[in-house]
């Protein structure tokens, strides 16, 4: 058996599919600001920086569909499609920019 390395992750062989069978949607997002904006994997996308222009109502209750601990950076003037995944669990959102602070429904 090889030596153990603290913090090492040893995944099962094969391919892992993130957020399988979870509802997703794709939105066009544009950074109208003069500074880069970075959004993390678990940030409630509805509550992102107001310099990001997209259909906020559609994004309510969603986060980026990217691996945990990663982020997407939007440079000034950048415009791209992003895939969002619905939040899971009790669907209560607290913090972020304080726009919900309770249940999503």
Swiss-Prot record:
Pathway it works in: Nitrogen metabolism; urea degradation; CO(2) and NH(3) from urea (urease route): step 1/1
One Gene Ontology biological process: urea catabolic process
GO molecular function ontology, one term from the record: urease activity
Enzyme class: hydrolase
Spans traversing the lipid bilayer: none
Keyword Hydrolase: yes
InterPro entries: Urease_beta-like, Urease_betasu_sf, Urease_subunit
The EC number(s) this enzyme carries: 3.5.1.5
Reactions mediated catalytically: urea + 2 H2O + H(+) = hydrogencarbonate + 2 NH4(+)
Domain of life: Bacteria
Chief site of localization: cytoplasm
Pfam families per record: Urease_beta
Keywords from the named record: Cytoplasm, Hydrolase
Keyword Hydrolase among UniProt keywords: yes
One cellular component (GO) term of this entry: urease complex
SUPFAM superfamilies xrefs: Urease, beta-subunit
Gene3D superfamilies: Urease, beta subunit (2.10.150.10)
Cellular localisation: Cytoplasm
Subunit description: Heterotrimer of UreA (gamma), UreB (beta) and UreC (alpha) subunits. Three heterotrimers associate to form the active enzyme.
Family (UniProt): Belongs to the urease beta subunit family.
NCBIfam families: PRK13203.1, urease_beta
Protein name: Urease subunit beta
Organism: Prochlorococcus marinus (strain MIT 9303)
Gene of this entry: ureB
